Every structure is written in C-alpha cells, then in structure tokens.
Amino acid sequence: VSLDDNIEKGETLVGLSVIDNPVVYIIFRDKLKKDTKEALSSLRDLNVNKIIMLTGDNEKTASRIAKEAGIDKYYSSLSPQDKLNIITSASDDDRPIAMVGDGINDTPCLANADIGIAMQSGNDGAISEVSDIIILNDSIDSIVLAKKISINTLKIGRQAVLIGITTCIILMIVATFGVLPAIIGAICQEGIDLISILWALRAHKQVK
C-alpha cells in the first residue's frame, strides 16, 4: 500500500528521516467516539436543523469524519480566524447558532456564537468566561442532555407563568363582582405565587 493510499483514506502521516533519508512513517487515524453518530441523530430529533464541522484538519480527513458521523457540511484546513469568519457569517441568519469547542483557539467562535458550549477544557481560562454552557467531559451525549434540559426548563417556565396569569385573571374577575373578599383574594394570590414557584422547581428533576 502506497503512502498516497493512506492520504486518500484521510489518515495523517508523520515521517522520521535520518540525513534526509526516510526511515519510518507513522500513520495517525482520527477515530470517532462511539457515541458520536447516535448523539448527532438525537440532536436532529430535538430540532437541531443543521450540523456543520469546522476543523483545521486536511480535506481528506475532514471528509471521512463528516461522512462517518453523518455531518451535514464541513469546512477543512481552517485557521481560528477562518472559523470565526464562518460563525460571524452564519449569525446573519435568523436561526440561532450554537458553537461547540474544546480548545483555547475556539474562544473567539464561542464568544460570537449565540450559544457557546465548551467541552472538557472549558473549565480553564478564557474559554470558560465566554461560554454559555460548560460540559465537564468530552461526551457528545452531554450536549444532547444539555439540549433536553433547556427544552424542559423552558417548558416548565412557560407553564408556571401560564398558571400564575390564568389564576390572577380569575381572581380579578371574581373580586370585581364582590364574590370574594379582598383579604381572601390576597391570601389566594400568595398561594398561587407559591404554587407557581413550586411548579417551576420541577425543572430540577433529572432529565434523561
């Protein structure tokens, strides 16, 4: 097998030479984490419409990884500034942009995306300061979990507001016609506020 075949497969070659004479070649192959493809599929089920990979890897490697993972689109051989330009351009769209990064070079992109998600190394330095979400591991499944938590929290928050507004309107109507004494109405209002708060606390329930 020639070295060109390895390059065509998207593998990275490192050569060791002695006095300009090649002695050995080391072949590196980026491998997908076992949960990657399933996690990306789960994100699509949660209405993540498009998944794009921005990488500094060469075209062949990027193409192979994107194909194996089922990524919609990819950009290869990018510098940090190139990535930032793409994020900035994509932000002109009406849809929110989430950026996932795991290195200090991703800091500008995380800062400029609508939602910056730092993974593993995001608990150190500048990257943690600009990120909206910090995931303390390198599992893509954790991004799916974060998405589920955000959906659940928003849903419960809306329900709590709806409960409060609806019951307040009912109390106002009842009080207007003198059916309910003012002091009883005030007590009911406090009770409704407490119910709304307790309802909102359901967001602490573990999402799976």
Regions found by a protein language model. Give the residues of each.
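Conserved ATP-binding TGD loop and adjacent catalytic N/P-domain core of P-type ATPases
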Residues: 10-159, 167, 197
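Residue-level signature of transmembrane alpha-helix interfaces in integral membrane proteins
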Residues: 86, 184, 194, 206-208
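A cytosolic-side transmembrane-helix exit/cap motif
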Residues: 136, 202-208
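Bilayer-spanning, highly hydrophobic alpha-helical transmembrane segments
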Residues: 158-190
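Structural signal for membrane-spanning alpha-helices in multi-pass inner-membrane proteins
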Residues: 171-176, 197-203
